[in-house]
Amino acid sequence: MAAAGAASNPGGGPEMVRGQAFDVGPRYINLAYIGEGAYGMVCSAHDNVNKVRVAIKKISPFEHQTYCQRTLREIKILLRFKHENIIGINDIIRAPTIEQMKDVYIVQDLMETDLYKLLKTQHLSNDHICYFLYQILRGLKYIHSANVLHRDLKPSNLLLNTTCDLKICDFGLARVADPDHDHTGFLTEYVATRWYRAPEIMLNSKGYTKSIDIWSVGCILAEMLSNRPIFPGKHYLDQLNHILGILGSPSQEDLNCIINLKARNYLLSLPHKNKVPWNRLFPNADPKALDLLDKMLTFNPHKRIEVEAALAHPYLEQYYDPSDEPVAEAPFKFEMELDDLPKETLKELIFEETARFQPGY
């Protein structure tokens, strides 16, 4: 009987893990179950070539346009990015023909845990909070320098290993920044995880500007300080109410930035709220951490701190080194917007994008 979570491979075909075939041999062997993603299973495996254990994500996206889109975005972006604080793609395994391709296996560095799991079990020291925040912002500086927005930064998308290295993952919702087309109506549905969503997403923004990611990093910093999410909204408007309950009512100047009248009138209809002092919410926190938190969790996206200024903030001074905070070689361009392409076309693009890993390529 195979151990729980271990793989069985009696006949030399694909290894089976919890009833799922993992067709990744002969290079990758000794599979062990790690967890389940939105559209696939993740296992660790031994890499026979590099003699290390790696993570392998099995993705089966081809039945759904949205899953194809996210898979293609993730692959396109991660193959072009190269940075210590962003998870890379080491290898991609798929069938040799498009007709046979039902799954895609993405091989990445094995990271022991993520910030979500860590915060469920550990109180972080100020030193750990400072070092994790520095690495998040160092990775984000590179992402933003490529003119890309992550748009789904949250603790479970920050991978960690035992030496406290941090890598940002999951670029399935990423976009090229497009401030000129950021405006939308009041309460348009938005996909990223609600608790880490900036207030303008609820009001009048598509989340196409870099300030959207900075807000999420502020939410993550607050969560590291207290081991609980700062704005755990139960639904769309509740999310906004949580934010205003701590930040207080927006100023007239901040209201003037909200072009959408429905959104502005909604805010004006709410009773006045005072800002809650950060040191009352986080009495044990380093005052410098709270100063940076305040600059990230700023209601008005135009006044929110940018990533370079955040890195240069006194709280991160022991790590700050602009000469060791690399930027992307060139801004990222999606030749085409993927949103409207049919899944058959997206499958062809995924097939092409992964060809470089095929034997004899």
From Swiss-Prot:
Dually phosphorylated on Thr-188 and Tyr-190, which activates the enzyme. Activated by tyrosine phosphorylation during the M phase of the meiotic cell cycle. Dephosphorylated and inactivated by DUSP1. InterPro entries: Kinase-like_dom_sf, MAP_kinase, MAP_kinase_CS, MAPK_ERK1/2, Prot_kinase_dom, Protein_kinase_ATP_BS, Ser/Thr_kinase_AS. It comes from the Eukaryota. A motif (TXY) lies at residues 188-190. Residues 28-316 form the Protein kinase domain. Its cofactor is Mg(2+). Its main location: cytoplasm. The TXY motif contains the threonine and tyrosine residues whose phosphorylation activates the MAP kinases. Belongs to the protein kinase superfamily. CMGC Ser/Thr protein kinase family. MAP kinase subfamily. This is Mitogen-activated protein kinase 1. It comes from Xenopus laevis.
